[in-house]
Each structure stands twice: as structure tokens, then as C-alpha cells.
């Protein structure tokens, strides 16, 4: 089996939690952070990997460990 990528883990987590890209964007705004539609789409599609601060924001919103989200190295448990 091929190794999972950041986008694989992001998509799977969003699917498991029934969260859409627009939900993540809205949640980021509620936390006082700006996350654009294009930016989010690029993360989900695997075109780009977020900076650490953005990955921490995504992990917080999705309630997963940031290390796992970025590298797959930690448990998927709550952040």
C-alpha cells in the first residue's frame, strides 16, 4: 500500500467527520484566521502542503494531532 500523504490524511479526516472545505474555512474565520477557498482546495488536492501555523489551525479545527496530519507519525487522536 502506498504511503499516505498530507492531503490523504486531510481528506480522510474531513470525510470521517463529515466536514466540507467550506466548514473548515468558516471555522478558521471563527478563530480569527483567514483561510481562502483556493488555499484550502490546494491542500485537499495535494498541490501544496501548508505552513506549520496553518497545519496547526487545520489540526485544531479537525481535532487531530498536527504531527500526524503533517507526517503521519503520531496517533490520530484528539489534539
Give a label for each model feature.
Residues 2, 18, 60, 70-79:
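Short, charged recognition helix plus adjacent turn
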Residues 15, 29, 45, 74:
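Residue-level detection of the helix-turn-helix DNA-binding "recognition helix"
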Residues 16, 27-32, 61:
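Residues within the alpha-helical elements of helix-turn-helix
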Residues 39, 44, 54, 70-73:
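DNA major-groove recognition helix of helix-turn-helix
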Residues 45-60, 76-78:
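Short, basic-rich loop-to-helix N-cap that marks the start of a DNA-contacting helix
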